[in-house]
């Protein structure tokens, strides 16, 4: 189709009955609603939150290995050491399943599995504590009161289990990798290292190379300290290590939680983890962590198994164990979305919805997660 350029810098495009015109600046580039930076659970969740709401995005992520690639993606609304609810658990659960279900439908592949978590009791005292706490108003929707005494072949559990409701796991690798393919096919994803000095901020608009956006959302995990606009936030890395084991004799339809989690992963493969270490020298797996996981696993797994893989990653955690969500004090269209920690698969969909609602409807963030708590 021939394009006609008018003397007034307008483009006219002939069609069947009439011509229409647009400003040349809009012809040569389209303004995205948001530019998203970061490829972990956080960045992937933001991409889908905006896309599912009909907003235009461009998403940039690199090949760096993050804790998201190591994580089991277990979503569990109960702190299983103290038998207490996770912060904002009920609100997070309201968002979680509808969000991941919508993503599954778009990807046409399964990314979540709604498996129960069985908390193995170590003694009779724990069992009694579970029964007592499970009837509390803030826990009765999260914990079954009656202990589970079903014997599982290969698992030693003399005192039985407490069953947590509304649990399961997100296949983090499938979620992230399939999402990148999905958005790349729509020219909305670039695999590259984000260069801060290439971001131009002018008159309330942003440009990064030939990408133009109304706002940018940084979801960079442990790269946050390198971000010139948000490096003041007190990020604390937390190293986590896990094992993938092969145990053909073990048949599980639930996630077992004892000193460590034991989760069915693929046929005859199980995820074991994880460690939590704030003092570390690098991201590589260590023999000490491997031995720790083995020792904890063998207190209750009584079947032969083979270690297939030993992985490690750094979790983006915060001093107060609350996410970093909000905008820059001076540049209002620069936003941060970080610090989801070890419960990212549970927290991120809810936090992403809050960010969307804040940006487009003015809904306020909970004070505990708003980065304004560090900007005064």
Role assignments for model-derived ranges:
Residues 37, 211-222:
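Short hydrophobic core segments
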Residues 163-215:
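Helical element adjacent to the flavin cofactor pocket in flavoenzyme catalytic cores
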Residues 52-69:
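Glycine-rich FAD pyrophosphate-binding loop
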Residues 42-53, 73-74, 79, 110-111, ...:
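Active-site substrate-recognition segment that forms the wall
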Residues 311-376:
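C-terminal catalytic lobe of FAD-dependent flavoproteins
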Residues 73-154:
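Dinucleotide-binding Rossmann-like beta1-alpha1 core, especially the glycine-rich loop
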Residues 31-40:
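Beta1/beta-strand and adjacent pyrophosphate-binding region of the FAD-binding site
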Residues 84-92, 162-178, 284-288:
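Short beta-strand to alpha-helix junction loop
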């Amino acid at each position: 189709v021939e394009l006609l350029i008018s003397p007034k810098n307008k483009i006219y495009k002939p069609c069947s009955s009439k011509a229409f015109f647009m400003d040349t600046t809009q012809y040569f580039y389209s303004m995205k609603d948001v530019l998203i930076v970061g490829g972990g659970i956080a960045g992937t969740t933001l991409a889908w939150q905006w896309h599912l709401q009909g907003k235009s995005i461009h998403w940039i992520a690199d090949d760096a290995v993050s804790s998201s690639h190591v994580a089991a993606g277990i979503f569990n609304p109960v702190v299983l050491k103290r038998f207490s609810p996770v912060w904002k658990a009920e609100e997070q659960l309201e968002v979680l399943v509808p969000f991941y279900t919508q993503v599954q439908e778009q990807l046409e592949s399964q990314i979540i599995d709604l498996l129960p978590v069985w908390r193995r009791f170590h003694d009779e005292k724990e069992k009694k504590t579970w029964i007592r706490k499970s009837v509390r108003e803030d826990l009765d929707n999260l914990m079954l009161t009656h202990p589970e005494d079903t014997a599982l072949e290969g698992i030693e559990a003399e005192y039985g289990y407490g069953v947590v409701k509304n649990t399961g796991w997100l296949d983090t690798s499938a979620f992230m990798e399939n999402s990148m393919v999905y958005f790349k096919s729509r020219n909305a994803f670039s695999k590259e290292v984000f260069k801060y000095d290439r971001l131009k901020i002018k008159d309330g608009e942003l440009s990064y190379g030939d990408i133009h956006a109304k706002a940018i959302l940084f979801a960079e995990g442990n790269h946050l300290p390198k971000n010139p606009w948000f490096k003041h936030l007190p990020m604390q890395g937390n190293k986590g290590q896990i094992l993938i084991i092969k145990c053909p004799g073990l048949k599980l339809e639930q996630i077992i939680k004892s000193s460590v989690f034991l989760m069915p992963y693929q046929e005859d493969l199980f995820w074991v983890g994880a460690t939590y270490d704030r003092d570390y020298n690098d991201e590589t797996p260590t023999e000490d962590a491997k031995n720790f996981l083995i020792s904890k696993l063998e207190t209750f797994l009584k079947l032969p198994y083979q270690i297939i893989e030993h992985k490690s990653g750094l979790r983006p955690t915060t001093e107060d164990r609350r996410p970093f969500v909000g905008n820059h004090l001076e540049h209002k269209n620069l936003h941060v979305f970080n610090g989801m920690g070890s419960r990212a698969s549970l927290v991120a969909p809810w936090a992403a919805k809050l960010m969307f609602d804040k940006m487009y409807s003015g809904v306020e963030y909970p004070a505990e997660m708003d980065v304004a708590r560090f900007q005064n």
